[in-house]
């Protein structure tokens, strides 16, 4: 009896451990196809929980109908096959085009890929309970231990995967390992055979199946979701990272694009640091050039490094500039040096930590002429970097006339995040001291695009800025400033909220972007 209980505890531990590994891996393996957002994790958690729930119900029926050890063995074997199927299915379905919105597409993908493995793993515990309970007088003790070991497996699976396994093994190697562990568990604990000859036959067949599946797995499942222009692919602790060759906006120059999850974040021309392909980065540069001309100093803090496109250009433009970059992912910083043209002996100071943590703990009060927020994208906005409290912390590090700049991807007509973020900054910097700068003069009729929000407690003389860049650049001007009166009218017309640490519904505010950018697709 004691031996059976120990065996049962090990089995439920393994099943729960593997379930949580699959759940955490799901977010990473889906990222190149649908990004990482609240909607992605909502679908993953919901589908996995639904699978476990239905699996527990079906497992109870199976346990009563087939109360023998081989039932457990076949479930462990099937769950191993299910784990091995995740990567091939992701490659197959992730590339498919669905005539539906992105949110529904995410739900469809997660259901097809993760429901069956979760459901089979959910069947295991009821079968284990049925096979273990022989003495009703000790039911509470036995069931309590089973639940304890099951929960322990979930806990260790969570921490081991998040803190260690993904960064050490990568998602596809990890899924391969999970599949093999479950299949081996079927052989060790499953009771699939009781006599020596059938055992030998089964082991031979199982070995052939495992080797065949491993070959198929490596042949197709390890095929990364990349094209022939992608020459670097890696999963870091924070992103799925890709670097690919692409043409610049003028379609004349080859550049290197840094892709974080699904989104091209930076485009760098390796031997031309002054090439700024993105319009919003050119707006940043125009504002800094104007400020440098007027004050002669340029101390800049970047929240989000990405490809270090503007920092490396500023280093050459202004040899006396102080440039600090806070980039949470040290692997991105390494790639910037190795592939994206940032020299090893750079004057740029990099800090690999969370942007808010850095700002909150910085002793450099009143140091910076500019703080540049470049950590937002359309599908995944770090909500803790959008709040009034964080804006107050950034304002502390700015000089009295220092300027905060942040790029925001939103729809002018339908967007809810942009007006909310502007109103939030007005709470800190004052009404009339926050400005909206667009790369196109017809800013009100453009759809989803990247705009720059500019804020300063002493105000920014945008008329002088516009005059300066007009004189210097003429037709090459990129920055188009919305008149303050029109901006205030816009804020009145659009629904918005003040974003605080207590209430920051960023994913709900960006939902219109999903509908407009990833609505019904036709191909």
Regions found by a protein language model. Give the residues of each.
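Alpha-helical transmembrane segments of multi-pass membrane proteins
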Residues: 1-233, 245-254, 262-265, 289-298, ...
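SAM/dcSAM-binding transferase cores
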Residues: 242, 447-523
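Short, solvent-exposed loop/turn elements at domain surfaces
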Residues: 250-254, 265-269, 462-464, 498-499
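Class I SAM-dependent methyltransferase Rossmann-like catalytic core
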Residues: 267-291
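Class I SAM-dependent methyltransferase core
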Residues: 302-305, 327
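Glycine-rich SAM-binding Motif I of class I
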Residues: 304-312
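Short alpha-helix immediately C-terminal to the canonical SAM-binding loop
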Residues: 333-334
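Glycine/threonine-rich flexible loop motifs
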Residues: 379-386
């Amino acid at each position: 009896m004691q031996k059976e209980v120990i065996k049962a505890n090990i089995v439920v531990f393994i099943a729960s451990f593997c379930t949580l590994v699959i759940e955490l891996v799901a977010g990473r393996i889906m990222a190149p196809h649908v990004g990482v957002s609240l909607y992605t994790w909502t679908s993953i958690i919901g589908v996995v929980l639904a699978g476990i729930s239905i699996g527990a119900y079906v497992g109870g029926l199976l346990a009563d109908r087939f109360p023998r050890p081989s039932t457990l063995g076949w479930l462990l074997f099937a769950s191993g096959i299910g784990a091995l199927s995740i990567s091939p299915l992701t490659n197959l379905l992730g590339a498919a085009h669905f005539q539906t919105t992105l949110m529904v597409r995410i739900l469809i993908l997660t259901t097809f890929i993760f429901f069956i493995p979760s459901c089979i793993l959910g069947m295991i515990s009821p079968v284990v309970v049925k096979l273990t309970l022989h003495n009703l007088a000790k039911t509470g003790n036995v069931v309590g231990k089973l639940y304890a070991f099951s929960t322990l497996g979930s806990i260790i699976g969570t921490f081991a995967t998040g803190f260690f396994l993904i960064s050490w093994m990568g998602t596809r190697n990890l899924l391969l390992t999970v599949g093999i562990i479950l299949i081996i568990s079927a052989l060790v604990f499953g009771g699939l055979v009781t006599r020596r000859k059938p055992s030998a036959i089964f082991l031979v067949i199982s070995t052939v199946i495992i080797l065949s599946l491993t070959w198929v797995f490596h042949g197709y499942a390890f095929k990364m979701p990349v094209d022939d222009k992608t020459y670097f692919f890696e999963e870091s602790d924070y992103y799925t990272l890709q670097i690919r060759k692409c043409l610049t906006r003028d379609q004349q120059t080859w550049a290197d694009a840094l892709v974080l999850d699904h989104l091209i974040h930076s485009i760098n021309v390796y031997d031309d640091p002054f090439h700024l392909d993105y319009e919003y980065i050119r707006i940043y540069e125009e504002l800094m050039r104007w400020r440098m001309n007027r004050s002669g100093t340029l101390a800049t803090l970047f929240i989000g490094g990405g490809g270090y496109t503007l920092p490396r250009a500023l280093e050459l433009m202004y040899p006396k500039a102080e440039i600090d970059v806070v980039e949470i992912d040290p692997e991105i910083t390494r790639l910037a040096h190795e592939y994206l043209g940032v020299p090893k002996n750079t004057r740029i100071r990099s800090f690999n930590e969370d942007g808010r943590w850095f700002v909150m703990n910085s002793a450099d009060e009143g140091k910076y002429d500019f703080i540049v927020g470049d950590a937002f994208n359309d599908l995944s906005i770090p909500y803790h970097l959008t709040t009034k409290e964080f804006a107050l912390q950034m304002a502390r590090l700015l000089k009295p006339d220092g300027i905060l700049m942040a790029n925001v991807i939103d729809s002018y007509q339908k967007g809810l995040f942009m007006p909310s973020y502007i109103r939030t900054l007005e709470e800190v910097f004052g009404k009339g001291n926050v400005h909206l700068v667009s790369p196109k003069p017809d800013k009100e009729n453009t759809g989803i695009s990247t705009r720059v929000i500019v804020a300063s407690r002493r105000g920014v003389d945008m008329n002088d800025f516009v005059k300066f860049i007009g004189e210097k650049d003429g037709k090459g001007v990129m920055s188009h400033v919305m008149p303050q009166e029109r901006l205030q009218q816009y804020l009145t017309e659009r629904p918005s909220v003040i974003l605080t640490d207590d209430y920051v519904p960023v994913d709900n505010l960006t939902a219109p972007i999903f509908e407009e950018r990833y609505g019904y697709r036709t191909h």
